[in-house]
Amino acid sequence: MTTIIAFIFVFGLIVFFHELGHFLFAKRAGIMVKDFSIGFGPKIFAYRKKETQYTIRLLPIGGYVRMAGEDGEEIELKPGYRVGLELTPEETVSKIIVNGKDQYVNAQPIEVSLCDLEKELFIEGYEDYDDTKKVRYQVERNALVIDGKIETMITPYDRSFNAKSLGNRAMTIFAGPLFNFILAILIFTALAFVQGGVPSTDNTLGNIMPDGAAAQAGLEKGDEVLSINGKETKSWTDIVQSVSENPGKTLDFKIDRDGKTQDIDVKPATQKENGKEVGKIGVETPMDTSFTAKITNGFTQTWNWIVQIFTILGNMFTGGFSLDMLNGPVGIYTSTQQVVQYGFMTVLNWTAVLSINLGIVNLLPLPALDGGRLMFFLYELVRGKPIDPKKEGIIHFAGFALLMVLMILVTWNDIQRAFF
């Protein structure tokens, strides 16, 4: 049960931040957002506020933000349609009832002759279905079209995705992966504050373990190690290397303590790691507890992981591709099961790493991914006009189908690794 809760928390948080990026930048650009959904499948929770419906769905392995104009959805009332109109006191249309007119007793019956619900926002027709009573009404920008129990808000063209500038469209799509990186930065920064600091690379000693060789020799926390056996030490890595390479051998530590230099002999204990003997003196990594270090930790950790993940991706394509290099939901669940054993802080760290992974994967220039859409925007920038929407739709559909096939293969491979 703990693993299931952790899995839902991790995926839910990552997906929420990704979709939040799309949502906020769409709103900033003036794009109508019709749906903000976390998860796929049947609805667990639904709430509508103004023009947007917010939903949580059963499967927490994805989400979406549905923006006006993205899916080609448009409301068309052809000449001859008989509808009911609810009017405001100013005689503008607030509701267009297509089906279920009997439930709106005050609706004005009209037979449509001409209608524009995108640009000029008007409806013309014959009142009471009488061709001698021609009328024309302006339609409210937030008017609803009611078809039985389904209510759909009209989309003025200037509120649609495609009506916006190339820069606004590109930023709205890029904002999803961007917010995945922001989530990682926030988590790594929070962890630095909770843990009281970040590991330092300085050549100073951290906490001294009571029964270790360092404590027995008289070393203290905060001692600056100038050299070991005459070899200058400039960083914590230099100290670790010198100690590890000399198990059971007495080492001359030249240290600076409170401005005074002194020599202390330390004999590292011998321990086995991966079948090899190494030296240990019982000293923890020094911590940088400064405010600046805690704040910058989020950025440096995120950047280091980005570089590392891109390096792995490069090796995948240059060194030969294998399904074992990829993890689907089952593989991530299995990894989460292991991570949970080390506590909540480790789960948070795992969430940050996964969020960076999702951000990078979504930026890959593949159809159906955010990166694929950004490539089409680049094409539009170079060519001066967008690709034909039908062609783009076909390419995205083909890309989505290939991704689904790959996901099925990866998931099957995950199941075999986990259970067979």
Swiss-Prot record:
Entry's transmembrane regions: 172-194, 304-326, 347-369, 393-412
Alphabetical list of InterPro entries matching this protein: PDZ, PDZ_sf, Pept_M50_Zn, Peptidase_M50
- Where is it predominantly found? membrane
Cofactor(s) listed = Zn(2+)
Which catalytic residues are annotated? E19
Q: Which UniProt keywords apply?
A: Cell membrane, Hydrolase, Membrane, Metal-binding, Metalloprotease, Protease, Transmembrane, Transmembrane helix, Zinc
Q: Where in the cell is it found?
A: Cell membrane
Residues the entry annotates as binding Zn(2+): H18, H22
Topologically, how does it sit relative to the membrane? Multi-pass membrane protein
* Single GO cellular component term: plasma membrane
NCBIfam families, from UniProt? RIP metalloprotease RseP (TIGR00054)
**Family under the similarity heading:** Belongs to the peptidase M50B family.
Tell me the protein's name.
Answer: Putative zinc metalloprotease Lin1355
**Which species does this protein come from?**
Listeria innocua serovar 6a (strain ATCC BAA-680 / CLIP 11262)
